[in-house]
Amino acid sequence: HVWRMDMKLDAKFNGVIFKVKDGTIVPDDEYMVFLAKDNAFAAILPIYREKCAEMGADIEHLAAVDRTIDRLRDWRELNYALNKLKA
């Protein structure tokens, strides 16, 4: 399937996503969802943070990613039985 401008970007999940900073709705064609239980996602999030730093992301964005990494780690430790693709 080829993505088109009139298609929802994330074909697996549905919902309404709001930006925390201003309460605006993020359009369906601008977001994707990854679950905390996904081991592949957990493994690449620190790499995403490194890439953001390399590309000049501001301190606020990097701090937000750091908080996300911390929350993800904590959730995964507390919910180990739910984690997918166990090594």
Task: Describe every region a protein language model picked out.
Residues Y31-Y80:
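Amphipathic alpha-helical packing elements
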Residues H1-M7, N79-A87:
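Short intrinsically disordered terminal tails
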Residues W3-F41:
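N-terminal acidic leader/helix
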